[in-house]
Amino acid sequence: MEFQVGKHDLTRHGLNEVDAATVDHFLGAADEAGAIAVLLSAGDPNRFPEATDVAVVLPELIAAFGGRLRGAVIARGDESALGQRFGVRVQPTLIFVAKGETLGLIAKIQDWSVYVDRITKLIDRPRGQSAAVAVTIVPQHRTQGVEL
């Protein structure tokens, strides 16, 4: 599967493509392995150029967390349906899921330290009904120019 024609072949990083028909199987396999599933809803890399950056970072995050994460890319044709299911509002977004629970979302490209901090908190937080709040990280808009 090619993420962006002629540039990044994500299968070489062990990232499979999932769609509406295969996502539950992927999530179940991650649960069986004791890992947290990380789904990339990238969007069109021509519209969202940072999608390519997030796609490059995801395999690095998986490696950094030493087997605690399993990653996949959502097929473009199913991004809308699966985005609604998991609460995606912007693209690109990383979706963290364990045991049927959406643990959190990290949108857009972030500094490495932000990824490590937020993912560590998502992995370590308690699960269940008292911990149902998902963390969504969206960078704040910064105005440019002179303030008067």
Curated annotation (Swiss-Prot):
Q: Which Pfam families match?
A: HyaE (PF07449)
Q: Which domain of life is it from?
A: Bacteria
Question: What is stated as this protein's family in its record?
Answer: Belongs to the HupG/HyaE family.
Name of this chain's protein: Hydrogenase expression/formation protein HupG
What organism does the record attribute this protein to? Bradyrhizobium diazoefficiens (strain JCM 10833 / BCRC 13528 / IAM 13628 / NBRC 14792 / USDA 110)
**Taxonomy of the source species:** Bacteria, Pseudomonadati, Pseudomonadota, Alphaproteobacteria, Hyphomicrobiales
